[in-house]
């Protein structure tokens, strides 16, 4: 089973965004994009990356968030078109990033457009809210978490919340009993970071993972490739970002 991981493509353009959509925290992100980010995130490089991945013939693609810059409706439509072009929902699993929920917004016009790519299999053991979701592909259990929450200006932190962590624990236990290789995906790093950029309940996530465990955790957010180990109680869990 070969799984590809892509994160933080920031693939959208902000040219269609209306000025009235920027009369909030988004204006800071817009200025960052206008002055710097639009040159840092190249569609050509993304296209080459996807072509390389296609050559590797992965069985599944996981995208760990930040498809957009500001989570605006026009961006989410553009990202939806891009997702539909590169693969079907049963081939691609995504979780949202902090840029995808930059501010509180109508989910039907924003993240809801990607729902088919971040929902449980129809017969999965997942019950309750959308996250965490469970998708089983061969011997692998793909468990997707959402750490994306609206934050104040100059903050890019994330949070999972008690309810999501409780459901995560149940899914990890159920899939362990099935003998599946469990991959947990979220946008923010599970390691401790600054309060401005980190996962606020990273400690609670560690406690959850310390029980049933997981075989692998993958994340994005840092805009750099990394490989580490997460110490969750007596367990050492590989982490790729």
What is each PLM-predicted segment?
Residues 10-14, 69-72, 98-106, 150-154, ...:
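Active-site environment of divalent metal-dependent phosphoester hydrolases
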Residues 77-167, 207-210, 233-235:
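Extended active-site neighborhood of metal-dependent phosphoesterases/phosphodiesterases
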């Amino acid at each position: 089973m070969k799984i590809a991981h892509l994160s933080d493509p920031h693939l959208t353009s902000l040219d269609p965004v209306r000025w009235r959509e920027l009369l909030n925290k988004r204006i800071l992100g817009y200025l960052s994009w206008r002055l710097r980010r639009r040159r840092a995130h190249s569609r050509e490089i993304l296209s080459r990356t996807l072509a390389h991945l296609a050559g590797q013939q992965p069985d599944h693609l996981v995208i760990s968030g930040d498809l957009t810059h500001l989570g605006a409706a026009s961006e989410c439509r553009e990202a939806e078109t891009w997702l539909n072009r590169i693969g079907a929902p049963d081939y691609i699993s995504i979780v949202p990033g902090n840029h995808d929920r930059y501010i509180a917004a109508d989910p039907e016009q924003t993240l809801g457009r990607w729902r088919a790519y971040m929902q449980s299999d129809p017969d999965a053991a997942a019950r309750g809210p959308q996250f965490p979701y469970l998708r089983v592909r061969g011997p692998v259990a793909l468990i997707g978490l959402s750490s994306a929450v609206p934050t104040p200006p100059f903050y890019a932190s994330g949070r999972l919340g008690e309810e999501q962590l409780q459901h995560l624990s149940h899914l990890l236990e159920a899939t362990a009993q099935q003998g599946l290789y469990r991959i947990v995906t979220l946008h923010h790093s599970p390691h401790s970071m600054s309060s401005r950029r980190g996962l606020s309940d990273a400690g609670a996530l560690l406690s959850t993972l310390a029980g049933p465990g997981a075989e692998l955790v993958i994340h994005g957010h840092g805009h750099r490739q990394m490989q580490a180990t997460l110490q969750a109680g007596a367990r050492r869990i590989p982490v790729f970002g």
